[in-house]
Amino acid sequence: MADQLIRATAADGGIRAVGVISTRLTEEARVRHKLSYVATAALGRAMTSGLLLASSMKREGSRVNIRIKGDGPLGGLLVDAGLDGTVRGYVGNPSVELPPNAKGKLDVGGAVGRDGYLYVVRDVGYGYPYSSTVELVSGEVGDDVAHYLITSEQTPSALLVGVFVDVTGVIASGGILLQVMPKAARDEELVSTLESRVGQLTGFTPLLRAGKTLPEIFEQLLGDLGLVILPEIQMVRFDCHCSFERVLGALKMLGEAELQDMIEKDDGAEATCQFCGEVYQASREHLTQLIEDLRAQSG
């Protein structure tokens, strides 16, 4: 199944639902960053969460940054997701590996750490990003993002994200976000019903591995609540904005002395993008041209 995002409503618009399949993009991140099993699960959950959060934004070019800094050996992670369906991200320690947790699953909470903070920055394109910080509740990513939605945005929310990875790579990755909108938030029975149904699920990836599609998952959860699945299917993908031109721009900011030192010591420069792992090589000729440009600007 292709990576995709779909939206739906239920209860006469009182419930907003979003679902994401992110298997291929999580696999691309795993390969690019050479991620361990648990690092793959952590970053995959975070990238899926980023896409789910970005899906509610309205203005073209809007993006969401999720940064998690816990006390675990993963060393934190950072995700950048857009309303356009693009996402990228990285972890501090891609090779970290831990024994399974008490449930026999990948110990994402242990890798991330249970003491720390989740930082969310929403950039809606007006030049004034909105930022919020909440304490981690479990380090499992999904619980922490749901906690952010409830405490910072005061929106009753259920968020379920998951990644299944084995020796062959990422087999399944994705998630769903259910939110009770303000006009229905006082309906305690509706909120309780949603919590109960989501709580009965054993996870998100088992549904995908069983062959369930996103519409079928929504039907299972919301079918008797006036479910309306919106017709648009949005493709989502791992995508980075880095380029050789940006690398040259960053090198130029180092100044003439530093560039000259690179030429003399290394005969060039190498830069690696943290978000996607792409390696860029700037030759002696490139650096010499940057120095000439700087001299021309100062002259």
UniProtKB/Swiss-Prot annotation:
GO terms for cellular component: cytoplasm. Disulfide bonds join C240-C242, C273-C276. One of its GO terms (molecular function) is protein folding chaperone. Transmembrane segments: none annotated. InterPro entries: Heat_shock_Hsp33, Heat_shock_Hsp33_C, Heat_shock_Hsp33_N. It is found in: Cytoplasm. GO terms for biological process: protein refolding. Keywords: Chaperone, Cytoplasm, Disulfide bond, Redox-active center, Zinc. Under oxidizing conditions two disulfide bonds are formed involving the reactive cysteines. Under reducing conditions zinc is bound to the reactive cysteines and the protein is inactive. It comes from the Bacteria. Belongs to the HSP33 family. NCBIfam families: PRK00114.1. Redox regulated molecular chaperone. Protects both thermally unfolding and oxidatively damaged proteins from irreversible aggregation. Plays an important role in the bacterial defense system toward oxidative stress. This is 33 kDa chaperonin. It comes from Gloeothece citriformis (strain PCC 7424). The lineage of its organism: Bacteria, Bacillati, Cyanobacteriota, Cyanophyceae, Oscillatoriophycideae.
